[in-house]
Amino acid sequence: IDYTSELDTESDPLLIIEKSVELENVSFAYPDGRQVLKDVNLTLPLGELVAIVGPTGAGKTTLAYLLPGYIKPSAGRIRFDNIDLAHTGVNEIRKQVTYVFQEHMLLSESIRDNLLLANPQATGEQMLEACRLAGAMEFIEQFPDGIDSVIGKGGDTLSVGQKQRLSIARGLVRETPILVLDEPTAALDPKTENSLVEALRNTAQGRLVVVIAHRLSTIREADRIIFLEEGQVRDVGNHASLMAQPTSAYRKFVELQNG
């Protein structure tokens, strides 16, 4: 389900992204002047699982919203394979990026219909594979009608964790080069979380997978951690390398989380 975007809808076409996303001196401020992101410079290669980490209000979701073009930078440039998104139509951007929201936006139809909403051309095999990767087959197989089971208004026959897994499966079935997930493991038990993180690592072998994460068990598995604080990138690296730096902001954050 797409949000409206501030980006132009009629612009140059976008080539299929094959290499990386680049953010150059990117800042974002609300109309009232509140600065959320300040001079962000990042290169995010395809093939990596990237975790965006930081305290509440650090700008994590704002940074993630820039990738599918839900908002546009107040300053700076975002490029997909050196193509400036400022000159790219929002429909072309959305062909490259899937965003899975923390809120579960489900149709009161069947599981199959919910998956087809994301990718009307998806085959049965693709849908089942997406459900398997997201850990959703565990509960889908318990329903008499399987993937054709109707889940009720807003998915009210499902638990919060089941809704989350189905939302993730819907994101996976689009098979876009960039997949962004907001708190994908928040409502999952440790076993399901471990399985999903492993699936995301496998999914990232050909895609850029970006997760906004709070759980250390998810964060430490990322190939690259971006630690945000007060709208600025304080640290970039993997868990081991950042924890090895005595003065890193990420290390201090982790130590506070662990008490």
Listing of model-derived features with the role each one plays in the protein:
Residues 53-55:
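The feature captures the beta-strand-to-loop junction immediately N-terminal to the Walker
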Residues 1-32, 72-79, 122-132, 208:
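ABC transporter TMD-NBD coupling linker
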Residues 68:
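Helix-to-loop junction immediately C-terminal to a conserved catalytic motif
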Residues 244-259:
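C-terminal boundary and immediately downstream tail of ABC-type ATPase nucleotide-binding domains
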Residues 23-26, 34-45, 50, 76, ...:
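Conserved beta-strand
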Residues 76-83, 93:
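Conserved ABC transporter NBD signature motif
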Residues 50-51, 99:
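Short beta-strand immediately N-terminal to the Walker A/P-loop
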Residues 62-65, 94-103, 111-114, 128-134, ...:
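ABC-family ATPase nucleotide-binding domain "signature/switch" substructure
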